[in-house]
Amino acid sequence: MRLTSIAVSMVLAALAGAARAGSEDEVKAVFAKFVAAQNAHDLKAVGDLLQGSPQFLWITRGAPIWGRDAALKRFEALYQGTWSLDPKTDEMKVVELQPNVAQLYVPVTFMIAPAGQTAQPARFLLNQVLVKTDAGWKISSILPIPAAQP
């Protein structure tokens, strides 16, 4: 009986690890879509990845933007100029905060400038919280933190 309990525990632990690994891969895939949509200035694709909630939060230039619609309006304005991001995916980390909630961390270089101006690279430590919904993983918050310059 004791051996059976140990065996069941080992199987459950292995399954939990596999589920975490699967979730990590799914979160990384959502982030890859987010980067592609951002760099293509594809508002619809970006919107499909953001959680459709007034509780969605994006901190940008020290100011909070609440809600997916407000975030999309801000992205639309930014897309009028230079806006691209280049993540260092080899440094990406995904942490499961609880089942169906994960935090993604990745250093990124943004190229940002208003239309007609020369973009300068800006380094950030990008943090996102993602929530698994019936429609898949959705980005619930975007928290870029300026990185120290090398």
Spell out what each predicted region is.
Residues 1-8:
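Bacterial N-terminal signal peptides that target proteins for export
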Residues 11-12, 16-49, 150:
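Short, low-complexity N-terminal intrinsically disordered segments enriched in polar/charged residues
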Residues 25, 43-97, 121:
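A solvent-exposed, acidic/Ser-Thr-rich amphipathic alpha-helical stretch
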Residues 87-89, 105-107, 120-127:
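Short, surface-exposed coil-to-beta transition loops
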Residues 94-102, 130-136:
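A short, structured loop/turn motif at beta-sheet edges
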Residues 100-110:
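A short hydrophobic beta-strand element
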